[in-house]
UniProtKB/Swiss-Prot annotation:
Naturally occurring in which organism (per UniProt): Pelotomaculum thermopropionicum (strain DSM 13744 / JCM 10971 / SI)
Assembly description: Homodimer.
Pfam families according to UniProt: DUF711
Protein name: UPF0210 protein PTH_0987
Superkingdom of source: Bacteria
SUPFAM superfamilies: PFL-like glycyl radical enzymes
PANTHER family: UPF0210 PROTEIN MJ1665, UPF0210 PROTEIN SPR0218
């Protein structure tokens, strides 16, 4: 039975500590939309998305009113378009992205993910066509997000794909240069990508998923920060327990909202992603949680240990609260979307190298990082390769969302607004890795991939 104290505590979390449900994401299988005629395939895609997701936004708003919990985003993920459009007789898949954009606008969601390809072991003809279409697709749409998986622990790293994505990211930045290269903010390169991730820009509906499903992403850095503040001076055991109990409460809310949405929409409930997702709002920062633990500034020595403790405690609390935890489920550290991260980068405490180290113990890693516009594609590819290596060796998801900001240099800023925020342009190493990334082929899977 709920106590009055628990009710008051929940109200405080929402009103004073920025607790919200970050996203309700409907995953939709588009495999039955395949058709050799590209126009027919696009029509099937539009019709299916608008039919299944037509009430998604309305349902989310009903749940907000019913429970008094803000649901910030209602989103859609679909089967990777490289799979759906494989049989189509067309050389350019950008029209499929525009169809997704139209469908997303029709149902009122702010993002739709799934303009994606899975190429960790090699390319199909459709994969080539989709990847070549990414810059145009992201430059001519507002709501479409794209992702490419280039590595897995079982397959190793497809360095041909890594090298190619360096050029694709660069071209995407150039085509959206008039908007601070925002196209790159909607493009993620993954290793060990999850198939049930509700968060953008990396969401897609995996081939092992059901016909339609509801996945939920929670938030709550502000709630965790205030809990950590109450444990000032306590030892690490007490600190971890404090975070764990708070994560339990946050995840319970996510599960309640997810199951309610699934029931109202008549589709299965999938997972709760328990990632701590920051926003640019004051007090809604993962970096500030780490600083409340005793760091003068996020990025200083000790940051990796603090983030490891935070991430582990969140997972333990979340796993106790729900039997269906999935997606990325860790702490996000997107520089442009976290006010504390931005301050740390401005102060010189948080560097690209430190963010790479933090990848080892958090959810994604190099996320929403602006780099100089003249950064060579080979350097971008090398950064992707470093992140992918961390992922495959440690059997975890890693990802890169870099913005080579056209016309900008280190110390300048890019401004995206909204949840994407603003970011200082961070310097990269001036030395070339071109000869290395141009070798091609696959970096073999690590020995710890042999688990049978």
């Amino acid at each position: 039975m709920l106590t009055l104290q628990e009710v008051v505590e929940t109200i405080k979390m929402v009103q004073e500590e920025n607790l919200d449900i970050r996203t309700i994401t409907m995953g939709i299988s588009l495999r039955d939309c395949a058709d050799p005629n590209p126009r027919a395939a696009r029509q099937k895609i539009y019709d299916k998305i608008t039919r299944l997701a037509g009430n998604l936004v309305k349902t989310g708003e009903e749940i907000e009113r019913e429970y008094g919990l803000p649901i910030v985003n209602k989103r859609i993920s679909v089967t990777p378009i490289a799979i759906v459009a494989e049989s189509c007789n067309t050389g350019n898949f950008a029209d499929f992205a525009r169809t997704l954009d139209e469908a997303a606008a029709a149902v009122g969601v702010n993002f739709i993910g799934g303009f994606s390809a899975l190429v960790h072991k090699g390319f199909t003809a459709a994969d080539h066509r989709l990847i070549d279409s990414i810059p145009e697709a992201l430059a001519t749409t507002e709501r479409v997000c794209s992702s490419v998986n280039v590595a897995t622990t079982k397959a190793g790293i497809n360095m041909d794909a890594v090298y190619r994505m360096g050029h694709i990211i660069k071209k995407t930045a150039e085509l959206t240069a008039d908007r601070d290269s925002i196209g790159c903010a909607k493009l993620v390169v993954f290793a060990n990508v999850p198939e049930d991730n509700p968060f953008m820009a990396g969401a897609f509906h995996g081939v092992g998923e059901p016909e339609c499903v509801i996945n939920v992403g929670v938030s709550g850095p502000g709630v965790v920060k205030n809990a950590v503040r109450t444990a000032k001076g306590a030892d690490f055991g007490v600190l971890a327990e404090t975070v764990k109990k708070t994560a339990f409460k946050i995840t319970r809310m996510g599960e309640l909202v997810g199951r309610t949405a699934a029931r109202k929409l008549g589709v299965p409930f999938g997972i709760v992603d328990i990632s701590l997702a920051p926003t640019p709002a004051v007090g809604d920062s993962v970096a500030e949680i780490l600083e409340c633990m005793g760091l003068e500034r996020c990025g200083t020595h000790g940051t990796t240990a603090a983030l490891a403790l935070l991430n582990d405690a969140v997972k333990k609390g979340g796993a106790m609260a729900s039997s269906y935890v999935g997606g990325l489920s860790g702490a996000f550290i997107p520089v442009s979307e976290d006010a504390g991260m931005i301050r740390a980068a401005e102060a010189g405490s948080l560097t690209l190298d430190k963010l790479e180290a933090l990848t080892c113990v958090c959810s994604v890693g190099l996320d929403m990082i602006a780099v100089p516009g003249d950064t060579p594609p080979e350097t971008i590819a090398a950064i992707i390769a470093d992140e992918a290596a961390i992922g495959i060796i440690n059997k975890k998801t890693t990802a890169v969302r870099l913005i080579p900001a056209a016309g900008k240099k280190a110390g300048d800023y890019v401004e995206f607004g909204g949840l994407l925020g603003r970011a200082p342009v961070m310097p990269v190493k001036p030395f070339s890795a071109g000869e290395f990334v141009r070798r091609g082929g696959r970096i073999p899977a690590p020995i710890n991939s042999l688990t049978n």
